Amino acid sequence: MELSYFHVAKDVPSGIKPETSVVIDVLRATTTIACALNNGAEAVQTFADLDNLKEQASCWPLSKRLLLGERGGKKIDGFDLGNSPLAVTSNVVKGKRLFMSTTNGTRSLERVKESKSLYTMSFINRKAVAEKLISNQSKSVLILGSGWEGAYSLEDSLAAGALASFLLNKNPNSVHILNDELSAAVALWSCWENNIEGCLRNATHGKRLERLGNHDDDFTCCSELDKICVVPTQREKGVLCSL
């Protein structure tokens, strides 16, 4: 298995259509997606463009849809929910389609939507995603972070390193790292694997969330490792389900 990692969507070379992609947005989109599907959401449909989201959502009955998203870490005016994984409880999301747009994560999903297989990952479902890649015998995997407004993020690289380290430990002779970005992410993981939440709080996006208010419970949730077994999978372009 060949692994490569790119910090943000714009770093992915043009013309690439990956066989398999894994999108990461630890704080907080891919954590929220995993939690929503784990709690029974019918699907999470992602959008980079808000007007497109509203148009598509209008085709669904009010009782079967939720608008979910943030800009700058704050809930979008008029939306049902923001981007907290704690808000997507079973009694709120079960059986519903979530229409989601975030500052960073949905851009990365848009960039690799042509992938043959597309998954989303955070710390909370790292093992499940890694085992899915192994069981699928994926030959080439592009791991894509989301960053913050087009710039590098510490927490996404930490998660990329966590995924690569798991795969390397499982199959050291058949997993190959193709770029320095991922080698650096693996090294970062070796430094912080015993204090994930500490790394998230030290990251600039973590500090940004702290300035917006008390997000202690979000930090705790986003730093939990291998807690749930859901693998958010693109069923059709832009639509993620638990398959």
Swiss-Prot record:
Judging by the UniProt lineage, the source's domain of life is Bacteria
Pfam families named in the record: 2-ph_phosp
Alphabetized, the UniProt keywords read: Hydrolase, Magnesium
* Catalytic reactions on record: (2R)-O-phospho-3-sulfolactate + H2O = (2R)-3-sulfolactate + phosphate
GO terms for molecular function, please?
2-phosphosulfolactate phosphatase activity; magnesium ion binding; sulfopyruvate decarboxylase activity
**Needed cofactors:** Mg(2+)
UniProt EC number: 3.1.3.71
Q: Which InterPro entries match?
A: ComB-like, ComB-like_sf
The answer to whether the entry has keyword Transport is no
Enumerate the HAMAP family for this protein. Answer: ComB (MF_00490)
Task: Give the family this protein belongs to, as stated in its UniProt record.
Answer: Belongs to the ComB family.
NCBIfam families in alphabetical order: PRK00886.1-2
PANTHER family assigned? 2-PHOSPHOSULFOLACTATE PHOSPHATASE-RELATED
Q: What is this protein called?
A: Probable 2-phosphosulfolactate phosphatase
| Species the sequence originates in | Prochlorococcus marinus (strain SARG / CCMP1375 / SS120)
